[in-house]
Design a protein with these regions (language model features):
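Helix-loop junctions and terminal segments of transmembrane helices
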Residues: 39-40, 68-85, 206-207, 266-300, ...
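Hydrophobic alpha-helical transmembrane segments
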Residues: 126-130, 155-204, 378-382, 396-420
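Membrane-interface junctions at transmembrane-helix termini in multi-pass inner-membrane proteins
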Residues: 79-84, 134-158, 181, 347-375
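Signature of the first transmembrane helix
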Residues: 3, 13-73, 106, 110, ...
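Interfacial segments at transmembrane-helix termini and the short loops linking adjacent helices
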Residues: 10-14, 113-129, 251-258, 304, ...
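Interhelical loop/hinge segments that connect adjacent transmembrane helices in multipass membrane
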Residues: 1-17, 152, 180-184, 198-240, ...
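Transmembrane helical elements of multi-pass membrane transporters/channels
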Residues: 20-35, 160-161, 165, 186-198, ...
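Interfacial/gating helices of multi-pass transporter permease domains
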Residues: 38-63, 123, 180-181, 185, ...
């Protein structure tokens, strides 16, 4: 297929990154379709209360996911891109750091539970889920394939993993009529399954994990670079997942658990395409880094084009979901119908998520790692404060409103910081379609 010529990109590079991004998209969309279908029949089987227990428990453990990941993924890609001959050292060091962090998170989650337990939820559920942080350490192989612009292998692993996961849950629902605890095991197994798949694919491509090695100085370098992103990631986890927990705890055991189970379906649809900016930015990040190094003017153009693309994609998605929300809940049992108007509000936060992902890579490229912590921390504080204010009177709708405002606040905080204000203005131009109209009138 002949690709159109786009200013700022040479044709060969464009084709390479277009194909890579397209493959990632296919993999994620295929996985998404499988996951959404699975989530619908699992939610209809568990009903709001049990679904609330599962969603609140996973949200609780997710708060520690950033600590387990150490915020290393972007830096691993960057290191592999700059020093490809040090592949085994970079991957080995990163794997040891992430697996150690995953192990440490297990007792940390236990200590957190002693101080802040969730009402009417057994710790055994939390304990099982706490192993997901350890299993996610294997995603260093994902970073390797990203750096090589070989996303077809990531796609293959994800689709295979999701098909197997869907089959397991199908059996639990329709054959075994399983209890809730088995779905907890299944969720944890999902993470392990994909992680093992990455390793098998890595070995299949002629690589071996047994050649990996650890470098103490590299470990220090990575941790020094990533600690702001660790804290930032924790803050992201807080303002992405704390709403589910607060909804349950503020509204009380029975009402709160059912509300969180219903709200989980909102979040699933609203955040369904949040992988798109991650895929696009992950695939284009090497090209953006090259432009920053070789041609500052092209670098700025690529950033503006990226912000424009994020707005157009997220705007189309938000409009579609907002209009289709009543139809979406036709697939659910009547117990979930109250979530339809909540989804129509919550989905508008995706615009700021898309822009936030794109601007986050800009911050990394420019070395403004600490700012990622500042802005996400700000968003988390806004989200928590608004949840306390709105949930008692508005319930799920209050949570949705708080989330949208928090996403907006976190993304556009950079406009108030002098050294990042130009990029904040670029995002505003994209948000209000100013940049798009400028391009139209220049033709």
């Amino acid at each position: 297929m002949k690709l159109p010529i786009i200013k700022g990109f040479d044709e060969a590079a464009l084709k390479k990154y277009f194909v890579n991004t397209g493959l990632l998209m296919i993999g994620r969309i295929g996985s998404l379709a499988i996951k959404m279908a699975t989530s619908i029949y699992v939610a209809n089987y568990l009903l709001p209360e049990k679904n609330g227990v599962l969603s609140t428990s996973t949200a609780y453990v997710f708060l520690f996911a950033a600590l387990a990941g150490l915020g290393l993924d972007s830096f691993i890609v960057k290191e592999l891109h700059q020093f490809p001959k040090k592949r085994d050292t970079i991957l080995g060091t990163s794997f040891l750091l992430k697996s150690t962090a995953g192990i440490i998170c297990i007792p940390l989650i236990f200590l957190a539970w002693q101080i802040f337990p969730l009402s009417n939820i057994a710790y055994s559920i939390i304990l099982i889920l706490s192993f997901t942080g350890l299993f996610q350490s294997f995603t260093v192989v994902d970073a390797y394939f990203q750096s090589e612009v070989q996303s077809k292998y990531i796609m293959q692993v994800q689709i295979a993993g999701n098909v197997i996961s869907a089959l397991i849950k199908f059996l639990l629902v329709f054959v075994f009529k399983a209890e809730l605890i088995y779905f907890v095991y299944a969720y944890t197994f999902d993470i392990l399954l994909v992680s093992v798949g990455y390793f098998l694919m890595y070995n299949r491509k002629g690589r071996s994990v047994f050649t990996w090695n650890y470098d103490k100085e590299l470990a220090k370098k990575l941790l020094k670079l990533s600690w702001p992103l660790i804290i930032s990631g924790i803050m992201v986890s807080v303002y992405m997942k704390i709403d589910t927990i607060m909804l349950k705890e503020i509204l009380g055991d029975d009402i709160g658990t059912k509300a969180s189970g219903t709200y989980a379906t909102v979040v699933m649809f609203s955040e369904a395409l949040n992988f798109i900016p991650v895929v696009i930015v992950s695939s284009l990040f090497p090209a953006i880094l090259n432009a920053r190094r070789d041609d500052p003017e092209r670098y700025q153009k690529r950033l503006q084009n990226l912000f424009d693309l994020m707005v157009w994609l997220s705007l189309a998605f938000a409009l579609f979901i907002a209009v289709a929300s009543p139809l979406i809940y036709k697939f659910y049992k009547p117990e979930f119908i109250a979530a339809a108007p909540v989804l129509a509000v919550h989905v508008w936060g995706s615009i700021f998520v898309f822009l936030g992902v794109a601007s986050g890579q800009f911050l990394i490229a420019e070395g403004f790692n600490k700012l990622t912590f500042i802005r996400t921390g700000f968003g988390a504080v806004i989200n928590i404060a608004l949840n306390f204010l709105l949930i008692p009177t508005m319930g799920m709708m209050g949570t949705a409103i708080a989330t949208v405002i928090a996403y907006f606040s976190a993304t556009f905080l950079i406009i108030f910081i002098p050294k990042t204000r130009p990029q904040g203005i670029m995002m505003l131009k994209s948000l209000f379609l100013v940049s798009a109209f400028q391009k139209i009138f220049k033709r």
